[in-house]
Amino acid sequence: MDEKEIKFIQDQIGYTFKNQELLVQAFTRRSYSMENGGQDNEVLEFIGDKALDFVVVKQLSEEFGHYSKKYQNWEKWGKTEETGTFISDLDEGELTEIKKQLVQKNTLADAIDNLGIAYYLIMGKGDVEKNIQDSLSVKEDLFEAILGAIALDSNWDIEALQDSMNVMLNPGELMFDEDVNYVAEIQAWSSANSGNIPLHCFYPTSMQGTWYMPRHHMCIYGKAEQDTHFACEVLIPGIDYHFVGYGRSKNLARMDASRLAYEYLKDEDMLFSIRDEIDDPNYNDSIGQLEILARRGYFSIPQYDFKETHDEDGNPVWNCKCSIKEKDTVTNGRSSSKKDAKKQAAYDMLTFVLEEE
């Protein structure tokens, strides 16, 4: 892994390593270390798994909880602080469900895909031949290993861990019912337009200091608020403008910059519709086409449920139901072939989502 690759990864995850060997280790699979010696990322995965649980619970308590009393602390220049009992807007079951969604395998794997960093995995020959980097479990492991490496490199700096988790995971998409997830929209647009993901550069800034405002590019700027601590510059392949957003965290700054980019694309009539994504909707490719739309953020990964019955002659008949979390409709396929039943259910669902648009 060279310096250019390390810089790209650090820009994407929103953290700069003091000890870059930890970052390289986070990307090193056991298959490589078995063949070449050195340390792999398995212990970092273990550390990152525990760190992820902690920072996600911390985030949930901050987003949905508050204390029963407030007071002004005059020893801190009248700063408003909280005390008393802790009150949560969500109950234990609701918090547990959100946490479960945030830390599950598919969520972490999707985050690695959105960051575009699985390509940099360091693998042994067997893993390379099997294209193991495409495995959901491997991407999940990579996410946890990176967070574990950050935990060690930062000496367990909770703010650094939470910051990086927010940048990598974008948890607001699951915690809040936003009309538009600007980060995901821009990532999907860039991938569809150029095959590449946007680049993110983060800079510390404050009302007391000098705002980060690059002058060497055409830029569109967000609005800086009083409690702003970070700037994020988003660069989209094929777009001349750079977009600079501000926020009290790196994640909020990235969201602001992505919003600016989204509004620019919308004003320029450059946004794709769901119909633009699939050139030729057809029965034979329907399963893959439906998954492409899901991977690009239009809806969740389709779920297929199968049931085998038999006709009067005892021949197998397969029934397949296709459902999508965000859609009320369930489509059905029926065939003597399990694969064809799945295709029929997928094609009917594909037709439904395209017509719905």
UniProtKB/Swiss-Prot annotation:
A Pfam family of this chain: dsrm
Protein name: Ribonuclease 3
Domain DRBM: 198-267, 285-355
Organism of origin: Roseburia hominis (strain DSM 16839 / JCM 17582 / NCIMB 14029 / A2-183)
Family: Belongs to the ribonuclease III family.
HAMAP family in alphabetical order: RNase_III
GO cellular component: cytoplasm
Binding positions (Mg(2+)): 45, 141, 144
Main location class: cytoplasm
Localization annotation: Cytoplasm
